[in-house]
């Protein structure tokens, strides 16, 4: 039995359930085949027919056979939505807000119980999603998983443009979870064969900026998406459903970029991005697909720390560059008579480069 059903079943033994509506089987099958429900379950057509989910974690599913039967998963979800509200944060409505919203709309579920979803509500309020940016850090040759670049999403609040507060935004990243110290050959092999679990992580954007532009000297391109606040909110709802949920991670297809395309399909149904990548999902190609889908509103560029330093050093002559290096090691030289003898504009350029 799926672990997410255990608290629900335990409470059912001593608390009455509200009656879930009786939905005709034909309608249930219609909803189970709807592209949006298929996207919420990360289902794809199996090679021998039927369905299989990209999710490799039984905790994600409410039905025992939910991994391969979208209809069974839908029926189990509908039933769980009517569990006693006393479950609180363990209630299906709290665990699956995106499923809940969609089923409520499709079936006009106006009589749902109202559990207190404190954990989810606080998490969503803290992120306060309004818009999204697709971020592309350039290739990093020291990592096999990033030799072709990488993509992540930045989730912005409403005032990010007017107050220039992008550093306070959140970065949504999907990456391989690696335990231990695998050597480079084993790392590459397991990455190619899906030997690592992949997880979503939401971290402050400033941490990713420091990692990419300063520690790894990678340039970043930020593609502002034209998602509405409602579309961005739908995407973040589903991210909550994927919290600590594992996928198999493959460097060349089921990777960071492919998973983000799935999220964009949740945000804006009908854009059909993932079907363009049946074999490989190279980050540069996925960015191009997002552009061709008309999702990009603006492009911003953030140079790496190395590029910034080179640009600052460019107007300096050899002696001034030497001063910049010395000042970087010892700022007390700002009071040196030889430095103070330089023209003020040159002093400013040297300090900027240091």
Describe each region flagged by the PLM.
Residues 98-142, 147-153, 268-269:
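Gly/Pro-rich turn-and-neighbor structural signature
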Residues 2-10:
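Sec-dependent signal peptide recognition
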Residues 20-113, 223, 240-354:
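Activation targets extended, charge/polar-rich intrinsically disordered C-terminal tails
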Residues 157-162, 230, 266-272:
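Secondary-structure boundary elements
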Residues 128-217:
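Glycine-rich catalytic cores of cysteine/serine-nucleophile enzymes that process amide/ester linkages
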Residues 14-16:
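N-terminal signal peptide c-region/cleavage motif recognized by signal peptidases
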Residues 186-257, 267:
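N-terminal accessory/precursor segments of enzymes
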